[in-house]
Amino acid sequence: MKTFSAKSHEVVHEWFVIDATDKVLGRVASEVALRLRGKHKPEYTPHVDTGDFIVVINSSKLRVTGTKGLNKIYYRHSGYPGGISSTNFDKMQDRFPGRALEKAVKGMLPKGPLGYAMIKKLKVYGDANHPHAAQQPKALEI
């Protein structure tokens, strides 16, 4: 029997919506990364984008365990000397709800053109409203 290899034009990308209210950041991120990659499908092929579109709502209500709210630090650099800045999880959630989830999922995806295409299929919204009702996303429970 020949090994099956999915073709990019034959893959069906479904839409799912996840409610992140009171969910732990890492557990949501790992499930989202798995679904974006397509590893939950039997026709998964490593070199083809077989994943689904994921819409995450209520990302402002994500939580972390222990003292990570204060102790988990996110760094970024402007490119200039001395241009490093840092913020913790709580401040990032207040300013940019959902960015912590995007960064967590991005770190779990492959680096390169395929990974960059996968992260574009993630849509994160801080509240319950999203503009993807026309795609009729199915609810996904984590």
Curated annotation (Swiss-Prot):
Q: Which CDD domains match?
A: Ribosomal_L13
Q: Which domain of life is it from?
A: Bacteria
Record's Pfam families?
Answer: Ribosomal_L13 (PF00572)
Task: Provide any one GO MF term from the record.
Answer: mRNA binding
Provide one Gene Ontology cellular component. Answer: cytosolic large ribosomal subunit
Q: Which UniProt keywords apply?
A: Ribonucleoprotein, Ribosomal protein
Does the record carry Transport as a key word?
A: no
Q: Which GO terms describe its biological process?
A: negative regulation of translation; translation
> Member of which family?
Belongs to the universal ribosomal protein uL13 family.
Q: Whom does it interact with, and what assembly results?
A: Part of the 50S ribosomal subunit.
Q: Which NCBIfam families match?
A: rplM_bact (TIGR01066)
The record's annotation in HAMAP family points to: Ribosomal_uL13
What this chain does, per the entry, is described as: This protein is one of the early assembly proteins of the 50S ribosomal subunit, although it is not seen to bind rRNA by itself. It is important during the early stages of 50S assembly.
Which named protein is this?
Large ribosomal subunit protein uL13
